[in-house]
Protein backbone atom coordinates (compact mmCIF):
# COMPACT_ATOMS: atom_id res chain seq x y z
CA UNK A 1 0.00 0.00 0.00
CA UNK A 2 1.32 3.45 -0.90
CA UNK A 3 0.52 6.61 1.02
CA UNK A 4 0.34 10.22 -0.09
CA UNK A 5 2.67 12.81 1.38
CA UNK A 6 0.79 15.85 2.67
CA UNK A 7 2.03 19.37 3.43
CA UNK A 8 0.93 22.65 5.03
CA UNK A 9 -1.37 23.40 2.10
CA UNK A 10 -3.27 20.20 2.87
CA UNK A 11 -4.04 21.23 6.45
CA UNK A 12 -7.38 22.84 5.69
CA UNK A 13 -8.75 23.43 9.20
CA UNK A 14 -7.07 25.36 12.02
CA UNK A 15 -8.56 22.89 14.48
CA UNK A 16 -6.45 24.06 17.41
CA UNK A 17 -7.64 27.66 17.20
CA UNK A 18 -9.23 28.69 20.47
CA UNK A 19 -8.20 25.44 22.17
CA UNK A 20 -6.28 25.20 25.42
CA UNK A 21 -3.49 22.68 24.83
CA UNK A 22 -1.84 20.71 27.64
CA UNK A 23 1.43 18.94 26.89
CA UNK A 24 1.88 16.23 29.52
CA UNK A 25 5.57 15.65 30.11
CA UNK A 26 8.48 17.93 29.36
CA UNK A 27 11.20 15.60 28.16
CA UNK A 28 12.69 15.02 24.72
CA UNK A 29 9.45 15.23 22.72
CA UNK A 30 7.50 17.26 25.27
CA UNK A 31 9.70 20.32 25.25
CA UNK A 32 9.84 20.31 21.43
CA UNK A 33 6.10 19.97 20.85
CA UNK A 34 5.30 22.59 23.48
CA UNK A 35 7.80 25.19 22.30
CA UNK A 36 7.03 24.72 18.61
CA UNK A 37 3.28 24.96 19.17
CA UNK A 38 3.72 28.08 21.29
CA UNK A 39 5.85 29.66 18.58
CA UNK A 40 3.09 28.75 16.10
CA UNK A 41 0.66 30.87 18.11
CA UNK A 42 -1.04 28.13 20.10
CA UNK A 43 -2.17 28.38 23.71
CA UNK A 44 0.04 25.82 25.46
CA UNK A 45 0.37 24.85 29.10
CA UNK A 46 2.48 22.09 30.64
CA UNK A 47 1.31 19.29 32.92
CA UNK A 48 4.09 17.50 34.76
CA UNK A 49 4.87 16.08 38.16
CA UNK A 50 7.07 18.16 40.50
CA UNK A 51 10.77 17.81 39.76
CA UNK A 52 13.32 18.82 37.16
CA UNK A 53 10.81 18.79 34.32
CA UNK A 54 8.44 21.07 36.22
CA UNK A 55 11.22 23.52 36.98
CA UNK A 56 12.53 23.45 33.41
CA UNK A 57 9.10 24.12 31.92
CA UNK A 58 8.63 27.15 34.19
CA UNK A 59 12.13 28.36 33.34
CA UNK A 60 11.17 28.16 29.65
CA UNK A 61 8.23 30.47 30.31
CA UNK A 62 5.29 28.06 30.37
CA UNK A 63 2.35 28.12 32.73
CA UNK A 64 3.10 24.85 34.47
CA UNK A 65 0.68 22.73 36.47
CA UNK A 66 0.30 19.28 37.92
CA UNK A 67 -1.00 16.74 35.42
CA UNK A 68 -4.40 16.80 37.10
CA UNK A 69 -4.67 20.59 36.94
CA UNK A 70 -3.49 20.79 33.34
CA UNK A 71 -5.97 18.15 32.22
CA UNK A 72 -8.85 20.01 33.86
CA UNK A 73 -7.88 23.23 32.08
CA UNK A 74 -7.28 21.77 28.63
CA UNK A 75 -9.34 20.91 25.58
CA UNK A 76 -6.52 18.95 23.92
CA UNK A 77 -4.17 16.80 26.00
CA UNK A 78 -0.98 15.41 24.45
CA UNK A 79 0.63 12.66 26.55
CA UNK A 80 4.39 12.72 26.00
CA UNK A 81 5.61 10.99 29.14
CA UNK A 82 7.70 7.81 28.70
CA UNK A 83 5.69 4.84 27.42
CA UNK A 84 6.10 2.78 30.56
CA UNK A 85 4.64 5.39 32.93
CA UNK A 86 1.76 6.54 30.74
CA UNK A 87 -0.77 3.99 31.97
CA UNK A 88 -0.48 4.84 35.66
CA UNK A 89 -0.28 8.55 34.87
CA UNK A 90 -3.38 8.37 32.70
CA UNK A 91 -5.44 6.33 35.16
CA UNK A 92 -4.51 8.39 38.22
CA UNK A 93 -4.39 11.95 36.91
CA UNK A 94 -5.82 12.27 33.41
CA UNK A 95 -8.80 9.93 33.03
CA UNK A 96 -10.76 11.28 36.03
CA UNK A 97 -10.54 14.79 34.60
CA UNK A 98 -11.46 14.24 30.95
CA UNK A 99 -14.64 15.74 29.55
CA UNK A 100 -16.73 14.76 26.54
CA UNK A 101 -15.34 16.42 23.43
CA UNK A 102 -11.76 16.55 24.69
CA UNK A 103 -8.98 15.19 22.50
CA UNK A 104 -6.11 13.04 23.75
CA UNK A 105 -2.97 12.69 21.67
CA UNK A 106 0.17 10.58 21.62
CA UNK A 107 3.46 10.60 19.72
CA UNK A 108 3.60 6.79 19.71
CA UNK A 109 0.76 4.30 19.63
CA UNK A 110 2.15 1.85 22.20
CA UNK A 111 -0.34 2.30 25.05
CA UNK A 112 -3.43 2.73 22.90
CA UNK A 113 -2.67 -0.09 20.47
CA UNK A 114 -1.84 -2.61 23.20
CA UNK A 115 -4.81 -1.37 25.27
CA UNK A 116 -2.90 -0.34 28.37
CA UNK A 117 -4.84 2.92 28.06
CA UNK A 118 -8.54 2.97 27.19
CA UNK A 119 -10.01 6.40 26.45
CA UNK A 120 -13.77 7.05 26.85
CA UNK A 121 -15.79 6.81 23.64
CA UNK A 122 -16.76 10.49 23.79
CA UNK A 123 -13.13 11.67 23.59
CA UNK A 124 -11.02 11.94 20.41
CA UNK A 125 -7.75 10.01 20.22
CA UNK A 126 -5.14 11.15 17.70
CA UNK A 127 -1.43 10.86 17.01
CA UNK A 128 1.38 13.11 15.83
CA UNK A 129 4.61 11.12 15.63
CA UNK A 130 7.61 13.12 14.39
CA UNK A 131 10.25 10.87 12.83
CA UNK A 132 13.09 12.25 14.86
CA UNK A 133 14.16 12.97 18.45
CA UNK A 134 12.82 16.00 20.25
CA UNK A 135 15.95 18.13 20.03
CA UNK A 136 15.86 17.75 16.24
CA UNK A 137 12.13 18.57 16.09
CA UNK A 138 12.88 21.80 17.93
CA UNK A 139 16.08 22.75 16.13
CA UNK A 140 14.74 22.20 12.62
CA UNK A 141 11.60 24.19 13.47
CA UNK A 142 13.77 27.12 14.54
CA UNK A 143 15.73 26.80 11.30
CA UNK A 144 12.53 27.23 9.29
CA UNK A 145 11.70 23.68 8.29
CA UNK A 146 10.99 20.59 10.38
CA UNK A 147 10.98 16.83 10.81
CA UNK A 148 8.46 14.68 8.88
CA UNK A 149 5.69 13.13 10.95
CA UNK A 150 3.10 10.40 10.91
CA UNK A 151 -0.43 11.19 12.00
CA UNK A 152 -3.34 8.92 12.86
CA UNK A 153 -6.80 8.83 14.37
CA UNK A 154 -7.78 5.99 16.69
CA UNK A 155 -11.08 7.40 17.91
CA UNK A 156 -13.12 10.19 16.29
CA UNK A 157 -15.79 11.17 18.79
CA UNK A 158 -16.29 14.72 17.52
CA UNK A 159 -15.73 14.30 13.79
CA UNK A 160 -12.76 16.65 14.14
CA UNK A 161 -9.98 14.28 15.25
CA UNK A 162 -8.19 14.17 11.90
CA UNK A 163 -8.21 17.95 11.67
CA UNK A 164 -6.73 18.17 15.16
CA UNK A 165 -4.01 15.65 14.29
CA UNK A 166 -3.05 17.46 11.10
CA UNK A 167 -3.11 20.90 12.71
CA UNK A 168 -0.95 19.61 15.54
CA UNK A 169 1.56 18.31 13.00
CA UNK A 170 1.50 21.69 11.30
CA UNK A 171 2.05 23.46 14.60
CA UNK A 172 5.19 21.47 15.41
CA UNK A 173 6.62 22.15 11.94
CA UNK A 174 6.20 18.70 10.45
CA UNK A 175 3.82 19.76 7.68
CA UNK A 176 6.57 21.98 6.26
CA UNK A 177 8.43 18.87 5.12
CA UNK A 178 5.74 16.19 4.92
CA UNK A 179 3.03 14.22 6.71
CA UNK A 180 2.02 10.61 6.21
CA UNK A 181 -1.30 9.24 7.43
CA UNK A 182 -1.12 5.89 9.23
CA UNK A 183 -2.95 3.87 11.88
CA UNK A 184 -2.10 3.23 15.52
CA UNK A 185 -1.48 -0.44 14.73
CA UNK A 186 0.83 0.26 11.80
CA UNK A 187 2.85 2.99 13.52
CA UNK A 188 3.28 1.02 16.73
CA UNK A 189 4.27 -2.31 15.23
CA UNK A 190 6.54 -0.87 12.54
CA UNK A 191 8.24 1.50 14.96
CA UNK A 192 8.97 -1.24 17.48
CA UNK A 193 10.19 -3.60 14.77
CA UNK A 194 12.49 -0.98 13.28
CA UNK A 195 14.00 -0.23 16.68
CA UNK A 196 14.47 -3.85 17.67
CA UNK A 197 15.44 -5.63 14.47
CA UNK A 198 17.39 -2.93 12.64
CA UNK A 199 18.03 0.52 14.11
CA UNK A 200 18.95 -0.31 17.70
CA UNK A 201 18.92 -4.02 18.48
CA UNK A 202 19.99 -5.32 15.10
CA UNK A 203 22.64 -2.67 14.53
CA UNK A 204 24.32 -2.88 17.92
CA UNK A 205 24.34 -6.69 17.78
CA UNK A 206 25.89 -6.58 14.29
CA UNK A 207 28.59 -4.13 15.38
CA UNK A 208 29.41 -6.09 18.51
CA UNK A 209 29.59 -9.38 16.59
CA UNK A 210 31.94 -7.85 14.03
CA UNK A 211 34.14 -6.43 16.78
CA UNK A 212 34.32 -9.81 18.51
CA UNK A 213 35.18 -11.66 15.29
CA UNK A 214 38.12 -9.33 14.63
CA UNK A 215 39.48 -9.22 18.18
CA UNK A 216 39.09 -12.97 18.66
CA UNK A 217 41.11 -13.42 15.47
CA UNK A 218 43.93 -11.39 17.03
CA UNK A 219 43.35 -7.95 15.54
CA UNK A 220 43.90 -4.86 17.68
CA UNK A 221 40.70 -3.76 19.46
CA UNK A 222 41.33 -0.13 18.56
CA UNK A 223 41.53 -0.90 14.85
CA UNK A 224 38.51 -3.18 15.08
CA UNK A 225 36.55 -0.34 16.67
CA UNK A 226 37.32 1.98 13.78
CA UNK A 227 36.41 -0.63 11.17
CA UNK A 228 33.06 -1.77 12.56
CA UNK A 229 31.78 1.21 14.57
CA UNK A 230 33.47 4.54 13.90
CA UNK A 231 33.06 4.32 10.13
CA UNK A 232 29.41 3.32 10.48
CA UNK A 233 28.33 6.97 10.57
CA UNK A 234 30.03 7.69 7.26
CA UNK A 235 28.15 4.88 5.55
CA UNK A 236 24.80 5.60 7.20
CA UNK A 237 25.05 9.28 6.24
CA UNK A 238 25.51 8.30 2.59
CA UNK A 239 22.52 5.94 2.70
CA UNK A 240 20.46 8.61 4.46
CA UNK A 241 21.31 11.16 1.77
CA UNK A 242 20.84 9.02 -1.31
CA UNK A 243 19.92 5.43 -0.53
CA UNK A 244 22.05 2.37 -1.20
CA UNK A 245 22.86 3.78 -4.64
CA UNK A 246 24.70 6.85 -3.35
CA UNK A 247 26.55 4.79 -0.78
CA UNK A 248 27.73 2.32 -3.39
CA UNK A 249 28.73 5.11 -5.75
CA UNK A 250 30.82 6.65 -2.98
CA UNK A 251 32.79 3.61 -1.84
CA UNK A 252 35.59 1.77 -3.62
CA UNK A 253 34.92 -0.96 -6.17
CA UNK A 254 36.49 -3.38 -3.71
CA UNK A 255 34.05 -2.40 -0.98
CA UNK A 256 31.10 -2.52 -3.37
CA UNK A 257 32.01 -6.00 -4.62
CA UNK A 258 32.40 -7.20 -1.03
CA UNK A 259 29.01 -5.69 -0.22
CA UNK A 260 27.30 -7.82 -2.85
CA UNK A 261 29.08 -11.11 -2.17
CA UNK A 262 29.36 -11.04 1.63
CA UNK A 263 26.30 -9.13 2.84
CA UNK A 264 23.95 -12.06 2.08
CA UNK A 265 26.35 -14.42 3.90
CA UNK A 266 25.87 -12.38 7.07
CA UNK A 267 22.18 -11.52 6.76
CA UNK A 268 20.93 -14.95 5.76
CA UNK A 269 17.43 -16.34 5.34
CA UNK A 270 17.72 -17.57 8.93
CA UNK A 271 18.32 -14.01 10.09
CA UNK A 272 15.20 -12.98 8.20
CA UNK A 273 13.27 -15.75 9.96
CA UNK A 274 14.58 -14.43 13.28
CA UNK A 275 13.32 -10.99 12.31
CA UNK A 276 9.90 -12.47 11.60
CA UNK A 277 9.90 -13.96 15.09
CA UNK A 278 10.71 -10.53 16.53
CA UNK A 279 7.81 -9.05 14.56
CA UNK A 280 5.49 -11.79 15.80
CA UNK A 281 6.35 -11.02 19.43
CA UNK A 282 5.51 -7.38 18.75
CA UNK A 283 2.25 -8.16 16.96
CA UNK A 284 0.96 -10.57 19.60
CA UNK A 285 1.78 -8.22 22.47
CA UNK A 286 4.48 -10.37 24.08
CA UNK A 287 7.15 -7.68 23.90
CA UNK A 288 4.80 -4.97 25.19
CA UNK A 289 3.68 -7.06 28.15
CA UNK A 290 7.23 -8.11 29.00
CA UNK A 291 8.39 -4.48 28.91
CA UNK A 292 5.55 -3.16 31.04
CA UNK A 293 5.78 -6.03 33.54
CA UNK A 294 9.52 -5.42 33.93
CA UNK A 295 8.83 -1.75 34.66
CA UNK A 296 6.17 -2.63 37.23
CA UNK A 297 8.61 -5.03 38.91
CA UNK A 298 11.23 -2.30 39.30
CA UNK A 299 13.06 -2.83 35.98
CA UNK A 300 15.26 -5.78 37.02
CA UNK A 301 15.72 -6.98 33.43
CA UNK A 302 16.37 -3.54 31.96
CA UNK A 303 18.86 -2.76 34.73
CA UNK A 304 20.71 -6.03 34.11
CA UNK A 305 20.77 -5.44 30.35
CA UNK A 306 22.19 -1.95 30.87
CA UNK A 307 24.92 -3.21 33.20
CA UNK A 308 25.87 -5.94 30.76
CA UNK A 309 26.01 -3.49 27.85
CA UNK A 310 28.11 -0.99 29.81
CA UNK A 311 30.76 -3.67 30.38
CA UNK A 312 31.25 -4.61 26.73
CA UNK A 313 34.86 -4.36 25.57
CA UNK A 314 33.86 -2.28 22.55
CA UNK A 315 32.36 0.35 24.86
CA UNK A 316 35.55 0.59 26.91
CA UNK A 317 37.74 0.83 23.80
CA UNK A 318 35.47 3.41 22.23
CA UNK A 319 35.42 5.59 25.35
CA UNK A 320 39.22 5.81 25.30
CA UNK A 321 39.46 6.47 21.56
CA UNK A 322 36.85 9.22 21.65
CA UNK A 323 38.95 11.13 24.19
CA UNK A 324 41.43 11.71 21.37
CA UNK A 325 38.65 12.86 19.02
CA UNK A 326 37.15 15.98 20.62
CA UNK A 327 35.14 16.62 17.46
CA UNK A 328 33.06 13.50 18.13
CA UNK A 329 29.88 13.90 20.14
CA UNK A 330 29.97 17.67 20.45
CA UNK A 331 26.85 18.34 18.42
CA UNK A 332 23.23 18.05 19.51
CA UNK A 333 24.01 18.00 23.23
CA UNK A 334 20.33 18.66 23.87
CA UNK A 335 19.67 15.08 22.78
CA UNK A 336 20.78 14.03 26.26
CA UNK A 337 18.91 16.69 28.22
CA UNK A 338 15.89 14.62 29.17
CA UNK A 339 14.00 16.31 31.96
CA UNK A 340 12.52 13.58 34.13
Swiss-Prot record:
Entry annotated with the keyword tRNA processing: no
Cellular component, GO annotation: cytosol
Note describing how the cofactor binds: Binds 2 magnesium ions per subunit.
Catalytic activity reported: (2R)-2,3-dihydroxy-3-methylbutanoate + NADP(+) = (2S)-2-acetolactate + NADPH + H(+); (2R,3R)-2,3-dihydroxy-3-methylpentanoate + NADP(+) = (S)-2-ethyl-2-hydroxy-3-oxobutanoate + NADPH + H(+)
Leading EC class: oxidoreductase
Active site (record annotation): 108
Span of domain KARI C-terminal knotted: 183-328
Keyword Magnesium in record: yes
Keywords, ordered alphabetically: Amino-acid biosynthesis, Branched-chain amino acid biosynthesis, Magnesium, Metal-binding, NADP, Oxidoreductase
SUPFAM superfamilies the UniProt entry points to: 6-phosphogluconate dehydrogenase C-terminal domain-like, NAD(P)-binding Rossmann-fold domains
EC number: 1.1.1.86
Residue sites binding Mg(2+) 2 per the record: 191, 227, 231
Superkingdom, taxonomy of origin: Bacteria
Record pathway: Amino-acid biosynthesis; L-isoleucine biosynthesis; L-isoleucine from 2-oxobutanoate: step 2/4; Amino-acid biosynthesis; L-valine biosynthesis; L-valine from pyruvate: step 2/4
InterPro entries for the chain: 6-PGluconate_DH-like_C_sf, KARI, KARI_C, KARI_N, KARI_prok, NAD(P)-bd_dom_sf
Cofactor: Mg(2+)
GO biological process, one term: isoleucine biosynthetic process
GO molecular function terms noted in the UniProt entry: ketol-acid reductoisomerase activity; magnesium ion binding; NADP binding
Ligand binding (Mg(2+) 1): 191, 195
Family label: Belongs to the ketol-acid reductoisomerase family.
Role of this protein: Involved in the biosynthesis of branched-chain amino acids (BCAA). Catalyzes an alkyl-migration followed by a ketol-acid reduction of (S)-2-acetolactate (S2AL) to yield (R)-2,3-dihydroxy-isovalerate. In the isomerase reaction, S2AL is rearranged via a Mg-dependent methyl migration to produce 3-hydroxy-3-methyl-2-ketobutyrate (HMKB). In the reductase reaction, this 2-ketoacid undergoes a metal-dependent reduction by NADPH to yield (R)-2,3-dihydroxy-isovalerate.
HAMAP family membership: IlvC
Name of the protein in its database record: Ketol-acid reductoisomerase (NADP(+))
Organism (species): Streptococcus pneumoniae (strain CGSP14)
